[in-house]
């Protein structure tokens, strides 16, 4: 079930606890039905923190709010994300989302926001081109900023991560490498989407930290020019 080990997963929960909110796409909700919460105690959180310099005040568990990008409002109202109390669930949908889906999600406590969509064109074969509608990341981040959010943990999956990378809407990358080789030509890439046409257009990273976590590797990097960006709004 897990590619990474317990130490890496514990560190991932630290990231959840130290951000204002975490963001996923509808694909993650439908495939995994996750709770998207921090499952560490206060003492476990303090012990697991890699950067001890931020322990200048008591650490308490912060359950991050949840942001779901869901164009058509397909999030089931029985999803486990609604099981955690005292946090907000934001669902961003397109103008084409059925009104009854918006109403159903609002009835179970979600805050639903309609945002603009952008069209991307993708070649399905050599002679067929299809239009794909994607929610505007810029519009979403603007609205989240208006709500007071300063740090968002984007957990994926591949399509969501590519949306942020392609629009340069990211400051920091934390990735984990497991110790198992799986392979496969059909394997899902960490960053999907269209990719960049040239190295010059591609975002460049500045690596700042690497750490071995019980035979896994944790790598931390910033997008070049964003090293000083404040990315942790909660502690």
Task: Describe the residue ranges of each PLM region.
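Enzymes that bind and transform nitrogen-containing heteroaromatic metabolites
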Residues: 1-235
């Amino acid at each position: 079930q897990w590619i990474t080990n317990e130490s890496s997963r514990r560190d991932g929960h630290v990231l959840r606890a130290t951000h204002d909110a975490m963001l996923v796409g509808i694909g993650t909700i439908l495939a995994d039905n996750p709770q998207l919460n921090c499952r560490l105690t206060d003492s476990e959180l303090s012990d697991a923190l890699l950067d001890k310099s931020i322990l200048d005040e008591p650490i308490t568990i912060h359950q991050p709010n949840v942001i779901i990008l869901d164009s058509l409002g397909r999030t089931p109202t029985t999803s486990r994300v609604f099981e955690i109390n005292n946090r907000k669930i934001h669902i961003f949908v397109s103008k084409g989302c059925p009104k009854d889906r918006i109403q159903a999600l609002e009835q179970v406590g979600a805050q639903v926001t309609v945002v603009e969509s952008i069209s991307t064109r993708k070649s399905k074969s050599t002679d067929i081109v299809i239009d794909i509608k994607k929610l505007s990341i810029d519009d979403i981040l603007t609205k989240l900023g208006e709500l007071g959010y300063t740090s968002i943990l984007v957990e994926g999956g591949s399509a969501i991560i590519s949306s942020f990378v392609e629009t340069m809407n990211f400051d920091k990358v934390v990735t984990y490498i497991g110790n198992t080789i799986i392979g496969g030509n059909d394997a899902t890439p960490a960053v999907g989407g269209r990719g960049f046409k040239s190295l010059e257009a591609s975002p460049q990273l500045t690596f700042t930290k690497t750490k071995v976590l019980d035979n896994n590797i944790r790598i931390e990097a910033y997008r070049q020019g964003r090293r000083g960006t404040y990315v942790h709004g909660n502690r």
